[in-house]
Regions:
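Active-site beta->alpha N-cap acidic-glycine motif
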Residues: 1-71, 114, 121, 125, ...
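Alpha-helical scaffolding within the catalytic cores
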Residues: 3-6, 56-65, 153-167, 189-201
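C-terminal domain-boundary segment and adjacent tail
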Residues: 11-14, 151-156, 204-256
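A cross-domain feature marking catalytic cores of carbohydrate-active enzymes
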Residues: 23-25, 49-53, 74-76, 130-133, ...
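Acidic-and-aromatic substrate-binding clefts and catalytic sites of carbohydrate-active enzymes
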Residues: 25-31, 50-61, 84, 128-139, ...
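Surface-exposed, active-site-proximal loop segments in enzymatic domains
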Residues: 83-95
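Catalytic domains of cell-wall/extracellular-matrix polysaccharide-remodeling enzymes
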Residues: 96-175, 219-226
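A conserved mid-domain beta-alpha-beta active-site/ligand-binding segment of alpha/beta enzyme cores
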Residues: 169-217, 222
Length: 256
């Protein structure tokens, strides 16, 4: 297969491709969340779950306490669109004063600290920001380390590994949802093409981990089936490893 061909290039170069899994928009304990956590447990693939602080429930925390393979990232503040009419959806955009947006993010961090304070979450709640709709005003990024963030994760190629000192950016590259086409599965062909393209780019241009992005609340059967078969197949392929967000976002000094 084309995927095997790409992984052969990695092996020929004596390198190991890194993949990671991010799922967005967690707010409550739902049947879809249960299905997601079951998939994580069955496959053993580490999952980074982006949680919306202003909407996250105690029930969510209770359910995640028993899911040690899941780390918690901060998904904006309230997942509210503040873009002007006709603009692309964005919560962390330039429409509002930076202090207001940064204040919201800091409030969100405190909310997650309270919600995920139990010993079960030690080392699992990460100071990583996932902007809603994967968009953030560039002017806000330099202030993120000042309010406690050590990581940033959006979608697509990154401009640089560390947009500002003390902030590591690791994105997702394979979105399984066809948002423009009504929210179903993009289909196996497109998903695999995105994955192979991102792996090739990581091999030849920017040595980053490649991220697969899921959205448990909107996934149809085709998406669930693809994700399960992908993780089951990939976990046994040589030349590739699944990485936990804890490893990816650890400081370079800590990883050496």
């Amino acid at each position: 297969s084309l995927l095997d061909d790409e992984l052969a290039h990695w092996r020929d170069a004596g390198r190991v491709a890194e993949l990671w899994w991010r799922d967005d928009d967690a707010v409550a304990e739902t049947p879809a969340l249960d299905r997601l956590l079951t998939l994580q447990q069955d496959t053993g693939v580490p999952l980074a779950l982006a949680v919306v602080p202003a909407r996250a429930t105690a029930g969510l925390a209770g359910r995640l306490a028993a899911a040690p393979g899941v780390s918690i990232l901060q998904h904006g503040y309230g997942h509210v669109n503040h873009a002007f009419d006709g603009g692309k959806k964005c919560e962390l955009g330039p429409e509002r004063p930076p202090m207001v947006v940064l204040g919201e993010l800091a409030t969100g961090t405190m909310a997650l600290e309270r919600l995920f304070a139990a010993p079960a979450f030690a080392g699992r709640r990460l100071p990583v920001l996932v902007p809603p709709w994967n968009r953030i005003a560039p002017g806000l990024v330099p202030a993120l380390p000042e309010i406690g963030f050590a990581g940033l994760s959006t979608y697509g190629p990154r401009q640089r590994p560390e947009p500002v000192r003390g902030l590591r950016q690791i994105n997702t590259h394979v979105d399984l949802i066809d948002w423009k086409g009504g929210g179903g599965f993009v289909g196996e062909n497109i998903a695999l093409a995105l994955l192979i393209d991102a792996l090739a780019a990581a091999r030849t241009r920017d040595a980053t981990a490649v991220g697969v992005l899921s959205h448990h609340l909107v996934m149809d059967e085709g998406t669930w089936d693809f994700l399960r078969s992908l993780w089951e197949k990939i976990s046994v392929k040589p030349g590739l490893r699944m990485s936990a967000a804890q490893e990816l976002f650890a400081s370079r000094e800590a990883r050496v």
